[in-house]
């Protein structure tokens, strides 16, 4: 049997419990066709880069699969039919990663960071400050509307 990583994007207007039920449904399809499901990671509701079927956000779920190709094909066929599934991607891998995926570790790193590694802004919120005299420029020309001519 081959090893696969499968990422599923579900609609934003269903609940997390419904997403978990979807994953359980597809786990049942895989197991009925002789496959096994390893790690299941829920990445939660995340913004999409662009709209997919009028959705701006989606529930992301990663599933590690050890199954024959026919079982994966049947799962993908059922996902195409389901309206709650926006997108999915199945990739064959040599071995599954141990521990958390890169998406979850990045989120944890972001939570631990205090923000002290960023430079402090000066008062007023602008970082350029006063630019001083621009001696390389001549005197300013009057604008057309300042000279009395209308546009």
Curated annotation (Swiss-Prot):
GO terms for biological process: translation. It comes from the Bacteria. Keywords: Ribonucleoprotein, Ribosomal protein, RNA-binding, rRNA-binding. Residues 96-151 are annotated as: Disordered. GO terms for molecular function: small ribosomal subunit rRNA binding; structural constituent of ribosome. Binds together with bS18 to 16S ribosomal RNA. This is Small ribosomal subunit protein bS6. It comes from Brucella anthropi (strain ATCC 49188 / DSM 6882 / CCUG 24695 / JCM 21032 / LMG 3331 / NBRC 15819 / NCTC 12168 / Alc 37). The gene is rpsF.
């Amino acid at each position: 049997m081959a090893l696969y990583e499968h990422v599923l994007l579900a609609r934003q207007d269903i609940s997390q419990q419904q997403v978990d039920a979807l994953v359980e449904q597809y786990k049942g399809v895989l197991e009925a066709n002789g496959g096994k499901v390893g790690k299941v990671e829920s990445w939660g509701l995340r913004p999409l880069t662009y709209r997919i079927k009028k959705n701006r956000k989606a529930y992301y779920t990663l599933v590690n699969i050890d199954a024959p190709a026919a079982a994966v094909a049947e799962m993908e066929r059922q996902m195409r039919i389901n309206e709650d599934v926006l997108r999915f991607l199945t990739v064959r891998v040599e071995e599954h990663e141990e521990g958390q995926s890169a998406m979850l570790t990045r989120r944890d790193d972001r939570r631990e960071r205090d923000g002290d590694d960023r430079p402090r802004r000066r008062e007023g919120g602008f970082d350029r400050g006063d630019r001083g005299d621009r001696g390389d420029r001549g005197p300013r020309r009057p604008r057309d509307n300042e000279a009395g001519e209308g546009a």
